[in-house]
């Protein structure tokens, strides 16, 4: 009986053996096996004992009991034996499996010492009354990382710690533009102006959903609308009616509009232009109440920019060193599922941010003229890079034997609480100890890479 595998990676040397099966038997009579199918891929087979199944069946029955009717019994009071006789216990199996499966699967993965990196594909092998259930799970495991050089790296960075007078002036000019006011313009609209418009769109004389707007503020040159729309409003004046003719992109989200010519009857209500304040001491006070003169503001901004440049320079060195460490490493057969999951995570995070701003996925794709596939492709390259980077940094942390102390975990919790302005106890409830330990070990690995790196 094997109770633990010390080196699972060596046991799954697919180059030497076509198929290896490892069997484990636990004290609770749960049996678990892993069959290697290919590099970083295999099938777990595991059983669920009756002492786990019976409570799950009870929970499944109690979940539906309140809705059950049977002659001679009040609604919700059907006895279990009557239910089993009338419907059969098997109708509870699916719900019971959903209850017991997560814990059983995690136990199997833990027993085998596998590092699973994607959602498994679960199949039922056997589910017989009164017997243990047998299930299989097709899994993808974390690939082996063969580290190259990651210490004393020499890197090149396209960054500087220097701050010029032009940098300071540019920052002040940005703030000056932010304080600009939109005023009514008595004349023709130009690029950079804002027009307030009504518009009605049609294709072949038929209006379409989402093609109408009233009192919409459109910045000319902002790229808010599909290509060609804004350019045709340059030169228009308040009171003008402009026929805007455009063609929807072939990749437009709304398939019924993609590639079609459209006409937008547009009414110009107002033309507005920016009026920027004078560059003087009064402007400086408006920008920052802690200064009295424009010169004071320049001194303050120089210090801020120097601090920011220092941080940007350090970040550039860190990024270049990590990139080189990743390039020096070899990742054995990176599973594509890891990339797909990272892409999906990024897309879901982005769309979640959009929805918090009141923009639905349908609205986003219609406004940008893109598709779900375009968005996935946009994040694909970055996802590939991020997954490889994380794998290499994890491997370095393991090679260096980095672990987190209790005091480091507590400090990390306090730092996060301060950063996100929430109680430390709330941080503890949101992040598990394992997550914190992992992040701290990763930070130590990054520190090893960057602290020993030098700039060419």
From Swiss-Prot:
Residues 192-277 form the PPIase FKBP-type domain. Pfam families: FKBP_C, Trigger_C, Trigger_N. Its main location: cytoplasm. It comes from the Bacteria. GO terms for molecular function: peptidyl-prolyl cis-trans isomerase activity; protein folding chaperone; ribosome binding. It is found in: Cytoplasm. It is an enzyme of class 5 (isomerase). Its EC number is 5.2.1.8. GO terms for cellular component: cytoplasm. GO terms for biological process: 'de novo' cotranslational protein folding; cell division; chaperone-mediated protein folding; protein transport; protein unfolding. InterPro entries: PPIase_dom_sf, PPIase_FKBP_dom, Trig_fac, Trigger_fac_C, Trigger_fac_C_sf, Trigger_fac_ribosome-bd_bac, Trigger_fac_ribosome-bd_sf, Trigger_fact/SurA_dom_sf. Keywords: Cell cycle, Cell division, Chaperone, Cytoplasm, Isomerase, Rotamase. PROSITE patterns: FKBP_PPIASE. It catalyses: [protein]-peptidylproline (omega=180) = [protein]-peptidylproline (omega=0). Belongs to the FKBP-type PPIase family. Tig subfamily. Consists of 3 domains; the N-terminus binds the ribosome, the middle domain has PPIase activity, while the C-terminus has intrinsic chaperone activity on its own. PANTHER family: TRIGGER FACTOR CHAPERONE AND PEPTIDYL-PROLYL CIS/TRANS ISOMERASE, TRIGGER FACTOR-LIKE PROTEIN TIG, CHLOROPLASTIC. NCBIfam families: tig. Involved in protein export. Acts as a chaperone by maintaining the newly synthesized protein in an open conformation. Functions as a peptidyl-prolyl cis-trans isomerase. This is Trigger factor.
């Amino acid at each position: 009986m094997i109770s633990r595998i010390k080196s699972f990676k060596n046991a799954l040397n697919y180059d030497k053996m076509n198929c290896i099966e490892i069997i484990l038997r636990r004290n609770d009579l749960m049996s678990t096996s892993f069959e290697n199918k290919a590099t970083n891929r295999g099938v777990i087979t595991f059983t669920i004992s009756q002492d786990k199944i019976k409570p799950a069946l009870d929970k499944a029955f109690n979940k539906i009991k309140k809705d059950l009717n049977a002659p001679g019994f009040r609604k919700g009071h059907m006895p279990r034996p009557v239910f089993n006789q009338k419907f059969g216990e098997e109708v509870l199996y699916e719900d019971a499996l959903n209850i017991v499966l997560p814990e059983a699967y995690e136990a199997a993965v833990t027993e085998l010492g596998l590092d699973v990196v994607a959602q498994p594909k679960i199949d039922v092998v056997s589910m017989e009354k009164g017997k243990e259930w047998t299930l299989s799970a097709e899994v993808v495991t974390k690939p082996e990382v063969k580290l190259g050089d990651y210490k004393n790296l020499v890197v090149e960075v396209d960054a500087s710690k220097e701050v010029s007078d032009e940098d300071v002036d540019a920052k002040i000019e940005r703030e000056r533009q932010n304080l600009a006011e939109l005023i009514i313009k008595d004349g023709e609209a130009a690029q950079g102006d804002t027009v307030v418009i009504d518009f009605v769109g049609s294709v072949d004389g038929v209006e379409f959903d989402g093609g109408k707007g009233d009192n919409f503020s459109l910045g000319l040159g902002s790229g808010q609308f599909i290509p060609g729309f804004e350019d045709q409003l340059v030169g228009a004046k308040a009171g003008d009616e402009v026929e805007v003719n455009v063609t929807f992109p072939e990749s437009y989200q709304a398939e019924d509009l993609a590639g079609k010519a459209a006409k937008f009857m547009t009414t110009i209500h107002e033309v507005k232009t920016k009026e920027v304040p004078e560059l003087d001491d009064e402007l400086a006070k408006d920008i920052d109440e802690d200064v009295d003169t424009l010169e004071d503001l320049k001194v303050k901004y120089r210090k801020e920019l120097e601090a920011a440049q220092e941080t940007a320079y350090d970040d550039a060195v860190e990024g270049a060193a990590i990139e080189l460490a990743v390039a020096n490493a070899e990742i054995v057969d990176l599973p594509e599922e890891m990339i797909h999951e990272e892409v999906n995570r990024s897309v879901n995070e982005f769309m979640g941010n959009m929805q918090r701003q009141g923009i639905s996925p349908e609205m986003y794709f219609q406004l940008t003229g893109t598709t779900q596939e375009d968005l996935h492709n946009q994040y694909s390259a970055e996802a590939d890079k991020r997954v490889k980077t994380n794998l290499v940094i994890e491997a370095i942390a393991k090679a260096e034997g980095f672990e987190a102390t209790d005091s480091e975990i507590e400090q990390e919790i306090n730092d996060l609480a301060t950063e996100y302005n929430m109680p430390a106890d709330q941080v503890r409830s949101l992040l598990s100890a394992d997550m914190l330990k992992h992040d701290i070990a990763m930070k130590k690995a990054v520190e090893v890479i960057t602290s020993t790196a030098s700039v060419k």
